[in-house]
């Protein structure tokens, strides 16, 4: 019996009807004792783990959209620094406003900056 290549197998699958593919899956379950749904769940797990591992983020000020004064005031209020410190941040875009913070902490900061007229991202 000739060895079946992946390419040949895929081409054969393309020619099958949905019913035939379902029957093939059932036959594979019986023959190998494998549940394809379990394999899909295992394959999806690494991506979910990466999302769960994202415990710290940074808030990045991307653009001032012509609202520089309002944004400088918002940055000053958020960081508790001086107007000059806030101005330095806003003058050098893109700029990290806060980093190594929890995603829950980043959302109010992002919202305040957006309300002031800024373009902001949480990374």
Swiss-Prot record:
Please state the gene responsible for encoding this protein: rplL
Top-level taxonomic group = Bacteria
Family statement drawn from the similarity comment of this UniProt entry? Belongs to the bacterial ribosomal protein bL12 family.
Cite the GO molecular-function annotations of the record. Answer: mRNA binding; structural constituent of ribosome
Q: Which GO terms describe its cellular component?
A: cytosolic large ribosomal subunit
The protein's UniProt keywords, in alphabetical order, are: Ribonucleoprotein, Ribosomal protein
The name this protein carries in UniProt is: Large ribosomal subunit protein bL12
Q: Does the keyword Kinase apply?
A: no
